From Swiss-Prot:
InterPro entries: Flagellar_assembly_factor_FliW (IPR003775), Flagellar_assmbl_FliW_dom_sf (IPR024046)
Coiled-coil regions, chain positions: none
Gene3D superfamilies in the cross-refs: BH3618-like
SUPFAM superfamilies: BH3618-like
Family: Belongs to the FliW family.
Highest taxon, organism lineage: Bacteria
Keyword hit for Transmembrane helix: no
Function, as annotated: Acts as an anti-CsrA protein, binds CsrA and prevents it from repressing translation of its target genes, one of which is flagellin. Binds to flagellin and participates in the assembly of the flagellum.
Location(s), subcellular: Cytoplasm
Main location per the UniProt record: cytoplasm
UniProt keyword annotations, A-Z: Bacterial flagellum biogenesis, Chaperone, Cytoplasm, Translation regulation
Gene Ontology terms describing biological process: bacterial-type flagellum assembly; regulation of translation
Gene name for this UniProt entry: fliW
Organism: Carboxydothermus hydrogenoformans (strain ATCC BAA-161 / DSM 6008 / Z-2901)
Protein name: Flagellar assembly factor FliW
Length: 154
C-alpha cells in the first residue's frame, strides 16, 4: 500500500493511502480532464466528505451522505449505470451528493438529481443523473445539518 502526499490550498498538506483514491473514467461534468480524486471524510461520523482532484488539488467538492438528512431519498441505478460502475448485488457502494454552501449562508444547496456513486471495491466512481424527479438545487437549513451531524457523534 502506498501513501499519497499532496498539497491543497484549501486543506494544506494531505496524506492518504491508496484506498481513498478513486478513478472517474469520464471525470466530472465540467472537469472531464480530471480522472483521479481523493475522497476523505471531514471527520469521524461527519456526514461530509471532500473530493479532491489529485492532479489539481485546488479543485475540490464538498459531498454529503444524503441518507443522514433525507430519509425518503433513494438512489436507483439503471442496469446500464450499474454496468458502467461494475456493480453487482454484493459490491459495496457509497452514494454521496455534491453540496454548495454559499459564504455566510443559512442553508446549503444539495444536488439530489446527480449523486456521485462510488464502487468501493474497484475504486471507480461516476456522477450519475437519476431518472427520478429530484431537484438539482435542494436547500437544507444549516441548523438541520448541524443537528443531524451532532446526533451522529453521540
Amino acid at each position: 500500500m502506498f501513501i499519497l502526499r499532496l498539497f491543497s490550498p484549501a486543506f494544506g498538506e494531505i496524506e492518504a493511502d491508496e484506498s481513498q483514491i478513486f478513478s472517474f473514467p469520464e471525470g466530472l461534468p465540467g472537469f472531464s480532464h480530471l480522472k483521479k480524486f481523493l475522497l476523505i471524510r471531514h471527520r469521524d461520523n461527519s456526514p461530509f466528505f471532500f473530493l479532491i482532484a489529485i492532479d489539481e488539488p485546488e479543485i475540490y467538492f464538498i459531498l454529503i451522505e444524503p441518507s443522514r438528512l433525507l430519509a425518503d431519498y433513494h438512489v436507483e441505478l439503471s442496469c446500464e449505470q450499474q454496468g458502467l460502475l461494475h456493480l453487482s448485488e454484493e459490491t459495496p457502494v457509497l452514494s454521496l451528493n455534491i453540496v454548495r454552501i454559499p459564504p455566510e449562508a443559512k442553508e446549503m444547496i444539495i444536488n439530489l438529481k446527480a449523486p456521485v456513486v462510488f464502487n468501493l471495491q474497484e475504486k471507480i466512481a461516476r456522477q450519475i443523473i437519476l431518472d427520478a424527479d429530484y431537484p438539482v438545487r435542494y436547500p437544507i437549513p444549516l441548523s438541520k445539518v448541524k443537528e443531524k451531524a451532532d446526533a451522529g457523534t453521540k
